[in-house]
Amino acid sequence: GPDQALVPPSGDGRRKVMRLLAVALGTMDKVVAVNYERRFRPKEIWHRPWLEQCDKQVTDGYRWLDNAFEGEWLAGTNMTQADITLAVFWDFGRATRPNFMDRLGCGRIAEMAHLLEATAPFQATQREAEPLPSNALE
């Protein structure tokens, strides 16, 4: 019911969660773009300025989100869709580019993601495949 909704139905709370989701989705889009470029295109034709710009956008996005926490969760005292989405995206980034993600220094995101990953719903959906080799993406 509404008391368990992950996105408030209206008002400032809804706008806050939607804003956090938008930044998380935009950040993840850049993570996927860089991974795609580095995984599927020959290294000699990578467009390095574009990759560097994407990495900067990923860094800025995650750091902005890390600074956006308003308590235990991103939007305050209750877990929202923004928290779940960010935890999943953080896990994907760590699986595909662990060295890059470690250098970001986003301790609040890492802590929140770690807490969520320990819950039964997250444990039930753990990936079975091995992560991509990090040397392919660094």
PLM regions: where:
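C-terminal end-helix/capping segment
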Residues: 104-125
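All-alpha amphipathic helical-bundle segments outside canonical DNA-binding/catalytic cores
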Residues: 8-16, 71-82
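Alpha-helical transition-metal enzyme core signature, strongest for iron centers
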Residues: 21-28, 55-58, 93
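GST-like domain detector, emphasizing the conserved glutathione-binding G-site
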Residues: 1-48
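Short helix-capping/linker segments at secondary-structure and domain boundaries
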Residues: 29, 40-43, 93-102
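Surface-exposed helix-capping loop/turn segments at secondary-structure junctions
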Residues: 2, 67-77, 120-126
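Amphipathic alpha-helical packing segments from all-alpha helical-bundle domains
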Residues: 50-68
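GST superfamily/GST-like fold recognition
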Residues: 74-98, 116
